[in-house]
Amino acid sequence: MPSTLDGITVLDLSTGPSAALTTMFLSDHGARVIRVLAPDAPLHRAGGFIIWDRGKECVRLDFDDKAKFQGLIAGADILVEDFAPSSSHQKLVERDALAKINPRLINCSITAYGKRGPLKDEPPLDDLVLARMGVLGGLPGFRPAPVHLVHPLPSV
């Protein structure tokens, strides 16, 4: 039986849980997901990646190999990344450059605070994101102060 996303190819450049989970769900719905890792990156950086990488193909790519990266971009329908605006990899995913290679590419960027604005370079630490959302002050606990949320809710 065909799946919703049969025939769709997704490039996964995730470095954290938000983008990894996003591409996991796309894979669950039938997309071909290609997880792109640097040659020296560990396959699973944290325990969750063992699950979040299910159903994905994995390729190791030196991002200096522009021809290979552009080949992946040319064959993709969707690119999912979570690079911080200050990341050295940010230049790889500039929309204008990608559009020249593949004008139909959908570029999905998942960041804690967006690519522009005063908080764009803030680290995406769960407690900071929760505090800015106003969630920590509303959590129940046995003390009058905010309670640390163990589950990384903002990351997902």
Give, region by region, the residue ranges found by the protein language model.
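Active-site-adjacent "lid/gating" segments in soluble enzymes
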Residues: F25, H29, H89-V156
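PLP-dependent aminotransferase-like
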Residues: L21-F63, L72-G75
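Active-site loop-to-helix junction immediately N-terminal to the catalytic Tyr of the SDR YXXXK motif
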Residues: S18
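Conserved beta-strand elements of the Class I
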Residues: T9-L11, I34
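Phosphate-coordination loops involved in phosphoryl transfer and adenosine-cofactor binding
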Residues: L5-G7
